Amino acid sequence: ADGSDPAGGEFLEAGGGVR
């Protein structure tokens, strides 16, 4: 959810750093 990962899993629209 920190936006560090463009394919994040917590909040896709926000980038989400957690998968």
Curated annotation (Swiss-Prot):
Conversion of fibrinogen to fibrin is triggered by thrombin, which cleaves fibrinopeptides A and B from alpha and beta chains, and thus exposes the N-terminal polymerization sites responsible for the formation of the soft clot. The soft clot is converted into the hard clot by factor XIIIA which catalyzes the epsilon-(gamma-glutamyl)lysine cross-linking between gamma chains (stronger) and between alpha chains (weaker) of different monomers. Cleaved by the protease thrombin to yield monomers which, together with fibrinogen beta (FGB) and fibrinogen gamma (FGG), polymerize to form an insoluble fibrin matrix. Fibrin has a major function in hemostasis as one of the primary components of blood clots. In addition, functions during the early stages of wound repair to stabilize the lesion and guide cell migration during re-epithelialization. Was originally thought to be essential for platelet aggregation, based on in vitro studies using anticoagulated blood. A long coiled coil structure formed by 3 polypeptide chains connects the central nodule to the C-terminal domains (distal nodules). The long C-terminal ends of the alpha chains fold back, contributing a fourth strand to the coiled coil structure. It comes from the Eukaryota. This is Fibrinogen alpha chain. It comes from Rangifer tarandus (Reindeer). It is found in: Secreted. Keywords: Adaptive immunity, Blood coagulation, Coiled coil, Disulfide bond, Hemostasis, Immunity, Innate immunity, Secreted. GO terms for cellular component: extracellular region.
